[in-house]
Amino acid sequence: MKQDNFDKGAWAAKKKAERQRVFAMVEQATQQLSDPAKLWEYLTIQQRFDRYTVSNALLVAAQCPTATRLADYETWAQRGVSVRRGAQSISILEPGKSYNWADGSVGRSFNIKHLFDIGQTNAPQTSPAKPDPKTLARAIVSSSPVRVRAVDSPGDFVARYDPAEKELRVARHRTPQQLCTGVLAAIVEARMDTELHDPPADPQANRDLALFMLCQRYGLPMQKPELSDRQKALDAKALRGELETVRRLTSGCMAAVEKQLAHLRQAEKGDHDER
């Protein structure tokens, strides 16, 4: 009879050490966000993978800042894609089972999941088509979570959120690019006002981080942000909490814009079909 040489204790110790290594990587990556270059790498990854938690986006940015499309080995294989020999996997955290502590609070275990970027495979890399500026501007304005009112305004005013009226005021006769950036900034403020129950440590800085990710997603120019002094003063866990709020706001904005873009594409397709 074949003897089972599997050492459960050694396996558990190996998995524990791996988790500790990944948790340490998250802490180190968080602390490095005071470096503007590291912050921009993180924000770039977070906007590409807007549904990833902050911790997992930090992990991806630390291990593969150029990542654009991630999947585990089995998923790539199911798609008929081969991972290149010698490719180094990217470790992220995957929620495991929940459990109850003695004080009644609920904890959750984590497993390590190993991913590979499309650049580590034999799959062709393609960039998604960007909408034209006019279509993007229409989608952004239509994605507002509050009512929109067009106004005549001189000067360089583009858009502003009025918290008292729960209304977005948008200037007429602006270029599509002006509308895209200006309205996105106002929408972020509207979502912060209507969706957040607890005020962030630095609302203006959070808005700038969210707007930078949105501008990156849609190919719009914007000055690169940095963490504010108040954000830098937060401990690592609290800072990730702030960034998680920013991530949720940004992801919500993206989902709303993508929904409107899909409607506009469908309407345009219908117009072409009728011709």
Residue ranges and their predicted role:
Residues 1-275:
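N-terminal accessory/interface modules of nucleic-acid-binding and processing proteins
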